[in-house]
């Protein structure tokens, strides 16, 4: 951007549309141009009624002047002025001479010289010989020479309506700029002389011949360019162009390429077309819209717009276009700017009520609460009365007035005049009609009214409370109006609220009437000072949700009342909830059109209100305005603008709040992308449908079922690292059915052996696991044919759930397909799973995970000892062996115990109901014949000795735990190899002894084997080995379940 270029005009706001419709009515027009003034904010708001306070910042008046050229036109100047003045009228004459009857004072007068630009006048000779080589340069030249912020071509709608079939008129003209190809022989002097003679065509030696009839000349003069054919401007493109043209007129031509005419008639614009002074040449404005943006700061000390009976304050924008020629008239337009004054943002008068509490001559105590010190025109004001009669007193009538006093000043406040006070009745509450009145009695007289304090049931004087929603109209009977408060020193408007109570009492056997009058000053604000214009927009969403129905009946409004929930808020005291749900609220108003319409709410007289109330054609009036709070109003609104009743401002930004999106419930999770993988083969089986996977099980497998099934799947007799179970989604294996039948036979024989053992030894169990029995004997011999199919399907579903649970417990990363696998199970099969002793019955602190990443501190610290595992490990030879290194915080050596990593998943460390004896009995219940050798392994206990602070570890973490004799406090605090060898030798000897016993007793029955193993187990609990070594629970009982149980 060149250094001599400056900002020509301010930006137009982004949220406003500056596109002028083709059918819009201009402020002024002629045959060649139209004039529009488009304001960004139709109303300017000032704060505070104290003109002495200047701490509030100035407000901005901004907008644009649009000059629409219909055909090429020469203009001499374009100017825009912002003017404001006050005028007071004095019919009796201004003292002392009384020869002047009007006083006018100027408030503001600011003028923008839009065309010609200032920099163009000083540089017109320098740019006279500058050629324009392209259409972009021609468009930049148009914008620069006209001084506009934005230039737009006319759309084809206007082309079709005003200049039909005239595109080829000027297309044949050769109007290329000087220096362009094909114009070397053009004589500049001849063309200047032709322009002075107002010729409408330019000849060229190389130009083609054409018909110069008047009709063709008219067509050529009014024809548009070909470039803007089929072009429809948008708000986004207009704003971007305005943004670019605001800061520079010499930007890249690509930003304005779509506005540049391509026909040759727009290229004949050089600086010699503009000449100032008499007899000079002027710039030719080509057809299109020339947009001039402007702004003006308005201080808070300026008075607001006032329109009183004997004075007013007015602001307006005045646009003037001067055209050259003696017979060309100037064009001017005028648009009023409305300035409204509202309360300051830190004012508390709106939220501060007026409270009046008095005692009238020890006869009546009353409280009056006026909800606010402000009144908004065409809105409601809540007022509450509370009466407590202290003696026999009669309250005949309640009236509420608003009074207005206008004062005028001139000659620096030396001359003053006050108008008579206007008094407007707003509400009247009358007592009930007295009985036995004559027919010709005047019902408006207070003596003919009953008592408002009397109970209608028994006739006693009781405490009464009345609530009113008083409507304050801006116009009364279409010829009187209530003016808002003013801050201008020469025109003052003051208002008071007046409450009148008509009382009577009996004095000396005569009834005397009294009138109590209560006056209080109150602010009356403009109708646009509602919360929709004074409060910030809501951050939770759109404050007003408008129904689409336009029916004015009360039924349609009530049906759409759910859409108006956000329209009402308790803080918006000026619009009660009853009115917001009534047809009075106009449904046809655009939600964002807040300030433009100024249609007043027409108020009704008392007679017309009574007529409408009693009319059968207005059922909505009977429903809404006959309520206790509204039926006493003298005036009723015919319509209220819906957007003005909003409790907060309506945002103009197209970006909505993210909180509003949270009101919509999220969609159901789609499990269609989840796959169930076969862990054994590593192949993907089938994909679970989203419809089936969305059904979660109502009765998931119990904790006991999961524990037992995990051991059935994981404990293999001759495998050190068992393979994970395979999970089939929808294609069960046929071989699994055969294995399941064999397993069921084995379980039946095992259950018979267990029953014989209990009958012989008469040792009852403390608790019987019904879930295990359901797995062991799901089928009976007497129902093989009738229920075999259903039981097999239920068994398959049960195994699928249990195998899924086993996979989830064994791997922390397998939770992705949990819901997918459960979705394929039927509801009946899921309900068949018992929920007794589920995982919810155990506290999280009593759960021990078998996964090394989620176990106790022993397994967390066990990784450090894996490096020295081969050095300190002493293996025990058994059927199913595994080695685990000792923990850094445990006093027990894991190396001498056969513990597999695949233990019971989610096994509770603390058991509430089971003892070790019962646990062994239950474990042996499902034990096959070839797995009883595991019972001969040393028994362990579930408790862990936390009093032993250190383990026997090669890497000491404390200075006292060293491998020297001086630091060994006990065999458990050091790494004494003698003690280790002695302990392991004893364990090896016991293991050999157990093997011998098993060899000798191989001919015993199964029950005798179980009995002997239980006796050894109980005797081992009291052995002295527990003094030196903390043992773990005998997990071999659950390890020995054969794989054939599947």
Curated annotation (Swiss-Prot):
Chain residue ranges for the region called Disordered: 115-141, 168-230, 605-627, 651-820, 868-889, 986-1017
Intracellular or extracellular location(s): Cytoplasm
Cross-referenced InterPro entries: Arrestin-like_C, Arrestin-like_N, Arrestin_C-like, Arrestin_domain-protein, Ig_E-set
GO CC annotations on file: cytoplasm; cytosol; early endosome; late endosome
SMART domains: Arrestin_C
Molecular function per GO: protein-macromolecule adaptor activity; ubiquitin protein ligase binding
Purpose: May regulate endocytosis by recruiting RSP5 ubiquitin ligase activity to specific plasma membrane proteins in response to extracellular stimuli.
Further facts: Present with 49 molecules/cell in log phase SD medium.
Subunit annotation: Interacts with PCL6, PCL7 and RSP5.
Family according to the record: Belongs to the ALY1 family.
Record protein name field: Arrestin-related trafficking adapter 3
């Amino acid at each position: 951007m060149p250094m001599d270029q400056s900002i020509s005009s301010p930006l137009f706001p982004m949220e406003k549309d500056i596109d002028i419709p083709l059918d819009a009515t201009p402020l002024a027009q002629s045959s060649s141009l139209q004039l529009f003034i488009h304001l960004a904010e139709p109303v300017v708001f000032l704060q505070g009624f104290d003109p002495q306070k200047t701490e509030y910042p100035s407000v901005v008046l901004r907008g644009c002047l649009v000059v629409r050229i219909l055909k090429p036109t020469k203009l001499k100047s374009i100017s825009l002025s912002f003017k404001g003045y006050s005028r007071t009228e004095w019919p009796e004459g201004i003292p002392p001479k009384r020869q002047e009857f009007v006083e006018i004072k100027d408030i503001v007068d600011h003028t923008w010289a839009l065309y010609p630009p200032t920099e163009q006048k000083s540089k017109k000779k320098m740019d006279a010989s500058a050629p324009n080589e392209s259409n972009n340069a021609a468009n930049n030249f148009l914008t620069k020479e006209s001084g506009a912020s934005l230039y737009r071509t006319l759309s084809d709608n206007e082309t079709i309506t005003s200049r039909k079939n005239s595109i080829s008129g000027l297309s044949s003209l050769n109007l290329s700029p000087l220096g362009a190809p094909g114009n070397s022989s053009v004589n500049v002097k001849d063309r200047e002389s032709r322009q002075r003679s107002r010729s409408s065509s330019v000849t060229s030696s190389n130009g083609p011949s054409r018909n110069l009839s008047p009709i063709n000349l008219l067509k050529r003069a009014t024809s548009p360019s070909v470039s803007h054919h089929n072009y429809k401007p948008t708000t986004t493109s207009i704003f971007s162009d305005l943004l670019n043209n605001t800061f520079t007129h010499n930007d890249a031509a690509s930003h304005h390429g779509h506005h540049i005419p391509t026909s040759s008639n727009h290229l004949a614009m050089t600086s010699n077309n503009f000449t100032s002074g008499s007899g000079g040449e002027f710039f030719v404005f080509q057809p299109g819209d020339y947009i001039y943006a402007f702004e003006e700061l308005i201080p808070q000390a300026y008075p607001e717009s006032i329109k009183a009976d004997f004075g007013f304050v007015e602001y307006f924008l005045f646009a003037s276009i001067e055209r050259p020629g003696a017979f060309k008239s100037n064009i001017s337009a005028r648009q009023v700017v409305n300035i409204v004054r509202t309360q300051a943002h830190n004012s508390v008068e709106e939220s501060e009520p007026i409270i009046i509490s008095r005692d009238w001559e020890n006869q009546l105590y009353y409280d009056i609460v006026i909800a606010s010190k402000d009144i908004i025109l065409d809105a409601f004001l809540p007022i509450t009365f509370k009466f407590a009669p202290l003696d026999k007193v009669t309250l005949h009538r309640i009236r509420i007035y608003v009074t207005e006093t206008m004062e005028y000043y001139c000659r620096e406040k030396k001359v003053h005049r006050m108008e008579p006070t206007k008094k407007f009745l707003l509400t009247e509450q009358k007592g009930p009609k007295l009985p036995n009145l004559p027919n010709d009695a005047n019902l408006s007289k207070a003596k003919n009214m009953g008592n408002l304090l009397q109970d209608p049931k028994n006739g006693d004087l009781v405490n009464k409370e009345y609530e009113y929603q008083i409507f304050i109209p801006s116009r009364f009977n279409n010829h009187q109006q209530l003016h808002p408060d003013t801050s201008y020193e020469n025109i003052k408007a003051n208002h008071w609220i007046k409450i009148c109570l008509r009382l009577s009492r009996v004095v000396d056997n005569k009834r005397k009437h009294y009138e109590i009058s209560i006056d209080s000053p109150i602010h009356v604000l403009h109708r646009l000072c509602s919360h929709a214009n004074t409060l910030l927009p809501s951050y939770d969403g759109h404050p007003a949700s408008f129904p689409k129905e336009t029916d004015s009946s009360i039924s349609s409004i009530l049906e759409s009342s759910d859409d108006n929930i956000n329209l009402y808020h308790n803080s918006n005291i000026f619009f009660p909830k009853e009115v917001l749900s009534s047809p009075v609220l106009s449904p046809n108003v655009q939600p964002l059109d807040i300030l433009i319409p100024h249609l007043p709410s027409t108020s009704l007289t008392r007679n017309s209100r009574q007529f409408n109330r009693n009319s059968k054609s207005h059922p909505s009036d009977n429903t809404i305005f006959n309520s206790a709070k509204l039926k006493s109003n003298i005036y009723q609104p015919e319509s209220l603008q819906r957007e003005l009743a909003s409790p907060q401002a309506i945002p103009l930004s197209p970006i909505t709040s993210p909180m509003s999106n949270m009101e919509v419930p999220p969609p159901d999770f789609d499990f269609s992308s989840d796959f169930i993988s076969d862990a054994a083969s590593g192949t993907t089986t089938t994909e679970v449908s989203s419809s089936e996977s969305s059904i979660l099980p109502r009765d998931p497998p119990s904790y006991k079922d999961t524990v037992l099934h995990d051991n059935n799947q994981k404990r293999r007799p001759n495998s050190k690292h068992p393979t994970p179970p395979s999970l089939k989604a929808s294609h069960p294996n046929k071989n699994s059915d055969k294995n399941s039948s064999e397993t069921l036979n084995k379980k039946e024989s095992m259950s018979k052996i267990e029953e014989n053992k209990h009958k012989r030894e008469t040792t009852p169990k403390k608790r019987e696991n019904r879930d295990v029995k359901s797995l062991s004997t799901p089928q009976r011999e007497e129902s093989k044919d009738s229920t075999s199919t259903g039981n097999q399907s239920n068994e398959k579903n049960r195994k699928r759930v249990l195998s899924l649970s086993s996979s989830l417990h064994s791997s922390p990363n397998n939770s992705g397909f949990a819901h997918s696998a459960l979705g394929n199970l039927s509801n009946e099969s899921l309900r068949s799973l018992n929920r007794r002793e589920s995982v919810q019955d155990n506290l999280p602190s009593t759960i021990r995970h078998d996964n090394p990443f989620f176990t106790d501190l022993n397994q967390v610290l066990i990784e450090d000892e894996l490096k020295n595992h081969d050095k300190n490990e002493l293996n025990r030879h058994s059927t199913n062996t595994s080695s685990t290194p000792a923990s850094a915080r445990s006093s027990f050596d894991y190396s001498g115990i056969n513990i597999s990593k695949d233990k019971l998943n989610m096994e509770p460390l603390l058991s509430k109901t089971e003892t070790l004896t019962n646990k062994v009995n239950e474990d042996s219940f499902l034990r096959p014949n070839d797995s009883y050798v595991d019972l001969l392994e040393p028994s362990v206990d579930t408790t862990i000795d936390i009093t032993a602070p250190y383990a026997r570890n090669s890497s000491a973490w404390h200075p006292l735990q060293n491998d020297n004799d001086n630091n060994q406090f006990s065999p458990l605090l050091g790494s004494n190899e003698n003690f280790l060898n002695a302990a392991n030798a004893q364990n090896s000897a016991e293991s050999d002894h157990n093997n011998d016993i098993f060899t000798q007793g191989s001919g015993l029955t199964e029950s005798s084997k179980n009995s002997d193993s239980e006796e050894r187990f109980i005797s081992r609990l009291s052995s002295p080995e527990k003094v030196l070594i903390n043992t773990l629970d005998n997990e071999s009982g659950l390890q020995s379940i054969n794989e054939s149980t599947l």
